[in-house]
Curated annotation (Swiss-Prot):
This is ATP synthase gamma chain. GO terms for cellular component: plasma membrane; proton-transporting ATP synthase complex. Produces ATP from ADP in the presence of a proton gradient across the membrane. The gamma chain is believed to be important in regulating ATPase activity and the flow of protons through the CF(0) complex. It comes from Mycolicibacterium gilvum (strain PYR-GCK). It is found in: Cell membrane. Gene3D superfamilies: 3.40.1380.10, ATP synthase, gamma subunit, helix hairpin domain. The gene is atpG.
């Protein structure tokens, strides 16, 4: 009985230590969510405007650019998988990796070979453990991404995409580099503190809705005059467009990671509280039984002495 009581008290101390860790992680994640959410909201207008501007440029001048035109018989598709560097964030990484596997299966059904790029140590470890090739990976900034991080990733993806413009099947073409024909990104969309979901988006070829001569119902159509010419503007803005899309995805993923970690740590803290209460109740019962037994032994001994007289 004494051994059982010592074991229960040891488990109570262990649960208390774990509770301190999970509570600290919960508080840290809570403090980061507001900042991450503010960064997401601040980046959205720029992302929306640059996409709108590129759409207007392409629609107004009917540009024929590699990032706009879908290639015939695409064979390879780059997929950027955005995960976290650390764990303790619930099903955050599992959902992203499941979404990426679904995208891989879809691409293979279409006859396209997925070319994997990763952000975060968790995705890199996932593919390395399964001995699957990762073309390039980035880590160390999943919770606090910067535009410089996004630009580095975007430059790599755009270079691979542009290298694929002259490829013919498995032939690397004139540049000798086997590139890709599509760019995709898998990340976690941040909708609210309580709602985040894994999503897959195609970055390139860019989808452009061409506007005809019809006037919109709610007013006249806006006419734009571009200086310099649309082609020059388009070449200058396209790299920024890809970097902006990647940056927006990194920011949403960072906010989602913090929200998921806060939720997971709060659940772990609550479970630790419940476990400690249950263990204390069991310990109190054991102690009560031990005291009752000791009293019974004392009374029994006293009665035995009285009878012997």
């Amino acid at each position: 009985m004494a051994a059982t009581l010592r074991e229960l008290r040891g488990r109570i101390r262990s649960a208390g230590s774990i509770k301190k860790i999970t509570k600290a992680q919960e508080l840290i994640a809570t403090s980061r969510i507001a900042k991450a959410q503010a960064r997401v909201e601040a980046a959205r207008p720029y992302s929306t405007e640059i996409t709108s501007m590129l759409t207007e440029l392409a629609s107004a001048s009917a540009l024929d650019h590699p990032l706009l035109v879908a290639r015939e018989n695409p064979r390879r598709a780059a997929v950027l998988v955005v995960s976290s560097d650390r764990g303790l964030c619930g099903a955050y990484n599992a959902n992203v990796l499941r979404q990426s596997e679904e995208l891989f299966a879809l691409l293979r059904e279409e006859g396209k070979e997925p070319v994997v790029y990763t952000v975060g140590r968790k995705a890199q470890g996932y593919f390395n453990f399964r001995q699957r090739e990762v073309t390039e990976s980035w880590s160390g900034f999943s919770e606090r991404p910067t535009y410089e991080n996004a630009k580095e990733i975007a430059d790599t993806l755009v270079a691979s995409f542009m290298s694929g413009a002259d490829d013919e099947g498995d032939d690397a073409g004139a540049d000798g580099v086997l590139g890709v024909d599509e760019l995709h990104i898998v990340f976690t969309e941040f909708r609210s503190m309580l709602s985040q979901s894994a999503a897959a988006r195609r970055i390139a070829p860019m989808v452009v809705e061409y506007v005809g001569d019809e006037q919109p119902e709610d007013g006249p159509q806006t006419l734009f005059s571009f200086e310099p010419d649309p082609e020059t503007l388009f070449d200058a803005l396209l790299p920024r467009y890809v970097a902006t899309r990647v940056y927006a995805a990194l920011l949403e993923a960072a906010a989602s990671e913090s929200a998921s970690r806060r939720r997971a740590m709060k659940s772990a803290t609550d479970n630790a509280d419940d476990l400690i209460k249950a263990l204390k109740l069991s310990a109190n019962r054991e102690r009560q039984a031990q005291i009752t037994q000791e009293i019974s032994e004392i009374v029994g001994g006293a009665n035995a002495l009285a009878d012997s007289r």
